Amino acid sequence: MAELGKKYCVYCLAEVSPLRFRCTECQDIELCPECFSAGAEIGHHRRYHGYQLVDGGRFTLWGPEAEGGWTSREEQLLLDAIEQFGFGNWEDMAAHVGASRTPQEVMEHYVSMYIHGNLGKACIPDTIPNRVTDHTCPSGGPLSPSLTTPLPPLDISVAEQQQLGYMPLRDDYEIEYDQDAETLISGLSVNYDDDDVEIELKRAHVDMYVRKLKERQRRKNIARDYNLVPAFLGKDKKEKEKALKRKITKEEKELRLKLRPLYQFMSCKEFDDLFENMHKEKMLRAKIRELQRYRRNGITKMEESAEYEAARHKREKRKENKNLAGSKRGKEDGKDSEFAAIENLPGFELLSDREKVLCSSLNLSPARYVTVKTIIIKDHLQKRQGIPSKSRLPSYLDKVLKKRILNFLTESGWISRDAS
């Protein structure tokens, strides 16, 4: 009895499941290739009837079937696999073709039949012309604005490289900015059955990752341009002193600090040129004001300006000496008037200048101050020696006066700070 699922030739009864010829005019007439090529006729079927080739995909194309030849179905799966997985991914290609083929068999069959075989010789020319055109400009020279000149490597020692986690040959750090940026694409994979929405979503992930890489490189360039790594290691102070040709004023330092957030939008040279031009502008304005002052004083030649400056310096020197002499007399008179209220009291000659100022400001007589000072120092020494003592300050000494005197004695070094 014929097995179910198999097809047989109606003329010779041979199995025709892999490949058979079906008559399009007669019903249930299917012939094997041998009977069809011999022009077999049976019943109402004639050799000149139309026919249809029915391929079951199981007939052998390459090699004898007994020796494991490749069927047409396997060939079709092989071509689909190499289009989907790419040349060289033999493991996935073998799994796609079927469990009966190993990766080694898939590789040997493809190389022998499609590269070194007749198909490869007919499709692949002996000499492949170079169709790639280099449209980039040379990396050096002024006529290459499209390419950035690579930055020189950092001049740091091996120990400093290990401290920073810096790899000079790759110009990378162990911990980069936005360290987890690669997680955006680490799980992406291009599948053969992805729809348009999934493809656009994966492209969006790749675009986000590219923007993160650009931001990482931008920060590297800023750090290299402004020498932030040597500044972190404390090696840029001597270089700055050598590079600067003039002393930076306090106003310029404050302005540099205010403009620091804008450093990322300009190069270091552009910022240095900006401040240098601002300094030149300031010097030019000062020179213009000086020339205008000469003109107001009737000087129209540079030779006359030297005599004018010498006379002006002499005049200012005389005025300064006169003011200095007057201020000295005023200080002496002021000091005498300041101590006039206590200079005739007993104990005034025992006080230092600072103590005289203190007693005058507190309106405290020298004798009372000496008494309070003696009691406070005595109590302090007894406490340091471990002798219990109870402070017995005079009744006329309130809390404000006590605090002022204690602070004064502490600042002068008579007692320690913990005692106050």
From Swiss-Prot:
PROSITE patterns: SANT (PS51293), ZF_ZZ_1 (PS01357), ZF_ZZ_2 (PS50135). The keyword Transcription regulation applies. Zn(2+) 1 binds at residues 9, 12, 32, 35. GO terms for molecular function: chromatin binding; transcription coactivator activity; zinc ion binding. Residues 65-118 form the SANT domain. A zinc finger (ZZ-type) spans 4-59. Coactivates PAX5-dependent transcription together with either SMARCA4 or GCN5L2. This is Transcriptional adapter 2-beta. It comes from Homo sapiens (Human). The gene is TADA2B.
